[in-house]
A protein has these predicted regions:
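C-terminal effector/interaction modules appended to NTPase cores
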Residues: 1-158
Length: 158
């Protein structure tokens, strides 16, 4: 396995659940992992199979569902919460907007309450993520307005 974001390779030598050794754990299980070389990991770190590494990037394309009365502002910095990690992001552009009335895509760039659009954003530090259609649990995030602390968008990474 690989531990991210430290990018350290190791092997799992023991899995414990309720103080008992088990052979298999699934996502969401509360377990203790013992690693071959005694690596210390923290909340928010990921343990992934070496052949299933997520994308690591500061440039992300995503679908967004806008949840706030104040329209999305291109160029504005927001807080992106992905799993247990928060990073600052800047909205770079609106690539296309989905018109839910006729199911067509438009080049309209104003994104208001309940609009759905494809956007490009840039994070202030690398983010490890999957495309939503590959792994919904690590392919989603929320966008938070830093001033109001309101959740303003729901994201599905492409």
């Amino acid at each position: 396995v690989i531990i991210l974001p430290a990018n350290m390779a190791t092997k799992i030598v023991k899995i414990e659940k309720n103080l008992e050794s088990i052979q298999v754990a699934k996502a969401g299980d509360n377990v203790v992992l013992h690693f071959e070389n005694n690596i210390d990991i923290s909340r928010g770190d990921s343990v992934v199979l070496y052949h299933e590494l997520p994308t690591e990037s500061t440039q992300i394309n995503s679908w967004i569902s806008w949840l706030d009365n104040t329209p999305l502002q291109v160029g504005k910095t927001y807080l992106l919460q992905h799993r247990f990690k928060n990073v600052r992001v800047k909205i770079q552009e609106v690539n296309q907007k989905w018109n839910i009335n006729d199911w067509e895509f438009t080049n309209e760039t104003e994104i208001k309450l309940n609009d759905i659009a494809q956007i490009s954003l840039r994070t202030n530090q690398p983010l490890f993520y999957d495309a939503f259609d590959k792994n919904p649990k690590s392919g989603n995030a929320i966008l938070i307005d830093e001033t109001s602390n309101n959740t303003v968008g729901a994201l599905m990474f492409l």
